[in-house]
Amino acid sequence: LFYLLRHGERSDFWRVCLCLFAGMTIALSCYVLLPTGLALRPYRVYGSDIFARLVRMLYAVDSSKNVCPSIHVLNTVTLMIGYRRGRRWMRPAANVLGVAIILSTMLLKQHSCIDVVLGAALAFALDAAASSLERSGEMRRVPQRL
């Protein structure tokens, strides 16, 4: 996001911000109206290596409640879409990093496949809505400077 602010077009930055803010607001509204949770995590994480310790620490601070749609995936896919409009060299790096983030949320049992699909669908729907706003001229009132 900071890359878009510093080096990208201002309209791309504001478009990504609009999608991020609207998406997180919609997701939080879903959590209030229909709380969700997962029981995917193991009862105990065995091992004394650094990775087992990190997973235990993650499980201690991040509960498996309010998971659908996934805000992790929503934000990641929104930024991947935003970087798609940017510089050409940034696209592969953003895609690889984005896929790694999405896979890590599932492999660490923070989200299920349904959470991931709904988070990505929300990101694409908000991008389509932002495109519609852009075509209608509503986005022209966006400030060009911060």
PLM segments and residue spans:
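Residues in soluble alpha-helical coiled-coils and helical-bundle/repeat scaffolds
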Residues: 4-7, 108
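Solvent-exposed, well-ordered amphipathic alpha-helical segments
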Residues: 84, 91-94, 110, 128-130
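Interfacial helix-loop-helix junctions of multi-pass membrane proteins
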Residues: 41-45, 63-68, 100-128
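Short, aromatic-rich membrane-interface segments at the entry and exit
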Residues: 14, 89-94, 112-116
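Residues within membrane-spanning alpha-helices of integral membrane proteins
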Residues: 1, 21, 78-79, 95-98, ...
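Membrane-interface loops
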Residues: 6-90, 102, 133-146
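Hydrophobic alpha-helical segments of polytopic membrane proteins
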Residues: 92, 117, 121-141
